[in-house]
């Protein structure tokens, strides 16, 4: 800015026309896909648990395999729960299938990504970049090669990796929701017996929940 030389920084990419791949087309995955489409990014998704025909209602292309999505997507955004099936779903074998210009985004659960393999993929130039809001271990081990390289701004990783402390939601509106919604949930349960957004309903039922 001091030199007023717009040619000094490296060129950045254009998002329009790049393929946005969503793994896990639930509520958050769908909301993310809609935002990507607003930037004229073609969207495709992989989710074996979404009913057939849902892609027609959403207007997004569906892939029948994870490999197909990884082969084609310029951006891969993760939106699955952490289960035995999804743990380390992004690993050395899946990262090598991704395009060299691709970017991996994980705002879901840290255990979905093998960060040892991600370190190797970034350092080896197999993918262009990654952005993580979640990690398998939180807070992370500062001695882990990927975390250390990020913390010391090593040249090979500079500008290619973003890390936030499980706080991608952090905004004034997000903080207001964080305070209001739990209270609304408790009030609804105590006054109406309705249990919303519960991840352990089966366990509560075992102990006499009214849900």
Where are these regions (language model features)?
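Rossmann-like adenosine-cofactor binding region
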Residues: 48-151
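Rossmann-like dinucleotide-binding domain for NAD(H)/NADP(H)
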Residues: 101, 109-211
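Residues at the starts of beta-strands that form the adenosine-phosphate
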Residues: 41-42
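Gly/Ala-rich phosphate-binding loop of Rossmann-like dinucleotide-binding domains
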Residues: 33, 37, 122-123
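N-terminal Rossmann-fold NAD(P) dinucleotide-binding loop
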Residues: 29-30
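Phosphate-binding beta-alpha-beta segment of Rossmann-like dinucleotide-binding domains, i.e.
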Residues: 1-19, 34
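Glycine-rich Rossmann-fold phosphate-binding loop(s) that bind the pyrophosphate
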Residues: 25-26
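Short, flexible hinge/linker loops that cap or flank conserved catalytic cores
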Residues: 12-16, 37, 96-97, 155
């Amino acid at each position: 800015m001091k030199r007023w030389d717009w040619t000094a920084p490296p060129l950045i990419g254009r998002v329009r026309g790049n393929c946005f791949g969503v793994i896990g087309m639930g509520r958050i995955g769908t909301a993310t896909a809609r935002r990507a489409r607003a930037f004229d990014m073609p969207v495709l998704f992989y989710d074996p648990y979404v009913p057939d025909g849902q892609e027609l209602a959403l207007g997004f292309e569906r892939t029948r395999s994870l490999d197909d999505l990884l082969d084609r997507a310029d951006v891969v955004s993760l939106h699955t729960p952490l289960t035995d099936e999804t743990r380390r779903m992004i690993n050395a074998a899946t990262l090598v299938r991704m395009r060299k210009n691709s970017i991996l985004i994980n705002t879901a659960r840290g255990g979905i990504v093998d960060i040892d393999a991600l370190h190797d993929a970034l350092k080896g130039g197999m993918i262009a970049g990654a952005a993580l809001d979640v990690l398998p271990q939180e807070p992370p081990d500062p001695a882990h090669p990927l975390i250390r390289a990020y913390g010391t701004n090593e040249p090979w990783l500079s500008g290619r990796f973003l890390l936030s402390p499980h706080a991608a939601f952090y905004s004034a509106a997000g903080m207001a929701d964080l305070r209001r919604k739990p209270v609304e949930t408790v009030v609804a349960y105590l006054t109406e017996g309705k249990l919303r957004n519960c991840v352990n309903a089966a366990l509560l039922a075992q102990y006499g929940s009214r849900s």
